């Protein structure tokens, strides 16, 4: 959203205003901004992490596949196996954020983990295209250099051989991304 906020500092400040109205925040401890908000917001926080000790919710025994991810979610001594039919390491973070929000609302970890296999991704975001060959085709609307790097990293996680990327610049919202 830098096309609107112009700098990361301005974006962080604007986003921080939202926490003035919250009873509880859900923050990713693996993210620099999440750690910054933890120290700079007025409301209590529920934290999650893929790899930091001390988070309220964490993931372990992570397995990445071309069509899905699997991991164990741990919170307050409770462990639930999660199967999410959306590939990529970032999917683990999205699942942890959703689980953390649900836990804050009083939902049971086991109940949420049970329905995760029925979650479908957003069309055009790490969308697996079925093909009759022994390779994987993904469609992703990677709309920034960082997003393109992330999808290529995701694909590399489960690609043994050659990785081919075809990309274009559709749309015209952010004029700084194309002539």
Spans of model-derived segments:
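Acidic, Mg2+-coordinating active-site environments of NTP-dependent enzymes
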Residues: 1-136, 160
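Glycine-/small-residue-rich active-site loops that bind phosphorylated ligands and cofactors
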Residues: 2, 89-90, 143-144, 172-173
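Active-site flanking residues adjacent to catalytic metal/cofactor-binding acidic residues
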Residues: 27, 139, 167
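Anionic group-transfer/hydrolysis microenvironments
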Residues: 30, 142, 170
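Conserved cofactor-binding/catalytic machinery of classical short-chain dehydrogenase/reductase
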Residues: 97, 143, 147
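Active-site beta-alpha connecting loops in nucleotide-dependent enzymes
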Residues: 122-124, 146-179
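Switch II (G3) loop of P-loop NTPases
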Residues: 136-143
